[in-house]
């Protein structure tokens, strides 16, 4: 196995979808570049392309991109057996929180505003747990 593949397996891979600047900056600052590779997508189409190439351990979907788009991305990931074990985190506004929808599709949801350190810690914990099980 080439060394690059070993590094990829050891490194946590995170895909941020529709995330606003402050959230991106916060996660970049709090997640070690040696331990985590973070990629970004602004749309469902980009998310699909990035997911195919990155095979992320976690996908963080910001509902700021639109509730329907965010739910569609989450549903499509869950339908695909390749991403059955992918950790899925939703970032919700008060409006999204009040609007009823099935949250079981997500491993975790955060309501804005939230502490970026808490999000980073939960991502680390959930990705670490996933990697131990694989």
PLM regions: where:
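Hydrophobic alpha-helical motif in two-component signaling modules
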Residues: 51, 60, 73-74, 83
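Alpha4 helix (beta4-alpha4-beta5 surface) of REC/receiver domains from two-component response regulators
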Residues: 72, 92-112, 117, 121
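Two-component/phosphorelay signaling modules centered on CheY-like receiver
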Residues: 21-39
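His-Asp phosphorelay/catalytic-motif detector in bacterial-type signaling
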Residues: 55-57, 81-88
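Acidic, metal-coordinating helix/loop segments flanking the phosphotransfer/catalytic sites
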Residues: 40-58
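Non-catalytic signal-transmission and effector/linker regions of two-component phosphorelay proteins
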Residues: 1-20, 115-134
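Acidic phosphotransfer microenvironment of two-component signaling modules
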Residues: 21, 42-46, 117
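Conserved phosphotransfer microenvironments
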Residues: 61-77
């Amino acid at each position: 196995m080439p060394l690059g593949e070993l590094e990829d397996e050891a490194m946590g891979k995170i895909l941020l979808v529709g995330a606003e600047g402050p959230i991106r900056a916060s996660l970049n600052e709090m997640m070690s570049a040696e331990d985590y590779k973070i990629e970004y997508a602004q749309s469902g189409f980009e998310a699909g392309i990035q997911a195919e190439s990155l095979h992320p351990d976690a996908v963080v979907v910001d509902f700021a991109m639109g509730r329907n788009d965010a739910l569609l991305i989450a549903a499509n990931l869950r339908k695909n057996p390749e991403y059955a074990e992918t950790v899925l985190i939703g970032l919700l506004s008060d409006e999204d929180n009040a609007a009823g929808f099935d949250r079981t599709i997500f491993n975790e949801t955060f309501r804005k505003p939230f502490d970026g350190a808490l999000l980073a810690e939960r991502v680390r914990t959930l990705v670490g747990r996933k990697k131990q099980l694989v």
